[in-house]
């Protein structure tokens, strides 16, 4: 579901991380685990209820994931912009336009237009659209510019292509 160099994993027991917790909201012990390994789905995110419904074991994710991370390259956001050359840097998404059954999405966005690897102009009131599976498969690289303050700790992501509408 992802390129081979991408792995997505959870580290819920990191010291001093804001999302760390020894137990999930169901009282189940949390543990480090891989959800995607070398681009292949290796585990679902399951709380006690969903695990019971699927006749599987809980993964200790009642209340969500904790310190979710993705493998990354060595480039920061500036390096990824240079690698991209010309395209759109999305800095803000608006709305809830994702179909969880088909993976299709259409969301309002804002950001910056990039020319020659440099930010050229601000862009707002645009729409980005596509399919999550196709987008995940077209990831070129994940950046090393990770902000550790949140629950999901992933750097900038360079995607090969995306549909854009607006001026």
What positions do the PLM features span?
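Dual-mode signal for accessory low-complexity, basic/Gly-rich regions
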Residues: 1-167
């Amino acid at each position: 579901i992802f390129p081979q160099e991408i792995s997505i994993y959870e580290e819920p027991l990191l010291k001093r991380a804001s999302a760390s917790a020894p137990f999930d909201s169901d009282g189940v012990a949390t543990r480090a685990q891989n959800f995607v390994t070398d681009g292949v789905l290796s585990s679902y995110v399951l709380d006690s209820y969903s695990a019971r419904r699927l006749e599987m074991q809980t993964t200790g994710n009642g209340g969500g994931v904790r310190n979710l991370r993705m493998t990354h390259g060595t480039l920061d956001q500036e390096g990824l912009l240079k690698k991209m050359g010309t395209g759109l840097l999305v800095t803000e998404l608006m709305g809830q336009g994702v179909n969880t059954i088909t993976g299709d999405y259409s969301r309002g966005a804002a950001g910056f237009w990039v020319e020659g690897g440099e930010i050229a102009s601000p862009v707002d009131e645009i729409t980005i659209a596509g399919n999550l599976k196709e987008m995940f498969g077209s990831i070129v690289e994940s950046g090393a510019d990770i902000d550790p303050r949140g629950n999901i700790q992933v750097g900038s992501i360079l995607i090969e292509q995306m549909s854009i509408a607006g001026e």
